[in-house]
Amino acid sequence: DEGKGKAVDFLAERVDYVARFNGGNNAGHTVINNFGTFKIHLVPSGIFAQNTTGLIGGGVVIDPQVLLEEIEMLNKAGIGVDGRLWVSPRSHIIMPYHKILDGLYEEAKGAGATGTTRRGIGPVFADKVSYNGIRWTDFTSDMFEQRLQVQLTLKNKIIVALGGEALKYEEIRDTYRGYYSRLKPYIRELFSIVQDGLKEGRNFLLEQ
């Protein structure tokens, strides 16, 4: 623990925007303040400064369940993130098969296992660079269903070959459509926010 969360929480009082620009929920920040003690993995820890807007950029891979849990926790604690937290529609999404493959790959390596958190971070980044990922932009049409069907066909072959159980399309489709419905109010193009902010001389803090 290097104290990054504490440092960001301190600096956030002096900036207008705090942005997460890469990584995922495999690591997190612990912030202790007047609201309590919080462990957050996706929402920028600068969100605790009431005049600061949090941005989650396209370089961040998102587990939607984790993000929703953090938003709910912060709102219940009186932080009030609605209207102050925006997620890039270009951010890639961690799917159930990413987590399963993360674990199966580790088991297959035996003594040479990497020691990952098994949260799907590596597999989702692999899909991103190989143009196999799913992003929030896909949910605005039936592109999500199309991409999910293709990816699930591919991923189930690997999962079964490594001794796992094939995943069901309908269950994943319905669950993730539900996630999108709940997160849609937070999904917004960030380019204009950043460009306008820079033109206006606003201060940005980049959080890793």
Which ranges hold each PLM region?
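Non-transmembrane, aqueous-exposed alpha-helical and coiled segments at domain scale
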Residues: 1-207
